[in-house]
Amino acid sequence: MTTNPSAELLDNLLTATGQTTAVREEVRVWSMSGVERVAFPDGSTAIFKYAKKPFDSEDQALRLAHTLGVPVPQVHASAVLNGWLGMLMEDLGPSVREADDLDGVAAAVILHGTRTAPPLPVLDQNRLRTLPARALEHLERLRKADRWQDADDVKDALDRIAQAAEARSAGATLEPFGWVHSEFHPTSLHIGERGWRLLDFARAFTGPGLLDLSSWHGTIEPPHPIRLRVYLEQYVTAGGTPDALAPRGGLTAEHWALGWHRMWAVEWFMEQSIRWINDPATDPAYIKAVRRHLTDVLHLLEI
């Protein structure tokens, strides 16, 4: 496992911003990233965020979003060391309340209305329809490592989805197509005294905006197409493109969005399992999540 170089990263960032010392306070830390509040001798504060691949280009996405007019925290300085990104960012302070559905659609309308930017990876129809095949490749590598041996049902489900993917991925580039936040949840929207800011751009890409809208209510509870339909209608009312309600891939917009969002999550979980986390001890939790999502995908995409 790569040693976390956060102390050295912070030293580099302090030098870059003309600071000499800072007191660190953990906000949230996990194996691949961390967020801390740092206090400087003059009483000012900043947010120190560090992350390893594949989360190591968030500074570029945040600066790009800021340039294009999306309300995001300002990046004061960033540095990369041994495959880890470190950022010193504006401290937004405490939130005054939790973000609600109307806050979410307002933020999505602004983000999705932003012109797309070349540095962002692209998830178009060709890329979308390969997600089940990519997940099968991850499964093959896991099994070669003598892991996921009792997951024939996962392979069978992915095979079925792969066969239907060409037809079901149709309409991927219908509007809204552009900036996708990809971690679009109420916790990613900070409502402060000076308005809102969108956080956590580490996995932003260019693709179907419906994936953002379908992620807002999370993946812990079973997917709820009727609730998403209401949310899509709120999005259109708030100024989002009416095409957000248009059928695609032979499905309603809400079924298409929820189904492909879950398939996108499955491929990401499996890539984490073999490539980024790569810890057999986590396999039972990953397999459980993948099975649950694949059941939803088969139902939502009517396969």
Placement of each model-derived feature along the sequence:
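Short Pro/Gly-enriched beta-strand edge/turn motifs at strand-loop
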Residues: 15-22, 57-58, 144-145, 161-173
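A glycine-centered beta->alpha junction motif in the catalytic cores
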Residues: 81-99, 136-147, 263-284
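Membrane-interface aromatic/basic loop that binds lipid-linked glycans or pyrophosphate carriers
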Residues: 291-303
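Active-site acidic catalytic loop and adjacent metal/ATP-binding pocket
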Residues: 28-40, 166-211
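Juxta-kinase regulatory segment immediately upstream of eukaryotic protein kinase catalytic domains
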Residues: 1-25
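ATP-binding pocket architecture of kinase catalytic cores
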Residues: 27, 32-127
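Active-site activation/catalytic loop segments of kinase-like enzymes and analogous catalytic loops
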Residues: 210-243, 259-282, 293-296
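A cross-family kinase active-site recognition segment
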Residues: 95-157, 175-177, 205-206, 288
